[in-house]
Amino acid sequence: MKMRYAITYGKMKEFKNSDETKKEYAKYKEAAEKAGLKLLLWGSPFGVAESSVVVIDFGGDMDKFVKFFSAQSGPWTDSRTDFVLEY
């Protein structure tokens, strides 16, 4: 088994409207794809303090994920990440 997915929670930045929100997440998805990652899902989580969640498939390459996440800011602040094993 190896780590494969990252679930990142954060406080969504202030955007003017839903179109701007979609645009920012689309830019983040494009940047992830250029780094060899896949942004699978994004949305609003339930039952946690954060207002944003993304699920990223990094294909088991933790170094690739850490490099991307360290260099690229997302449309959120105050993030935390859980990693999920591929079974």
Question: Where would I find each of the regions flagged by the language model?
Answer:
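Short S/T/G/P-rich N-terminal loop/turn motif that feeds into the first structured element of a domain
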Residues: 1-51, 57-67, 83-87
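A common structural junction motif
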Residues: 70-78
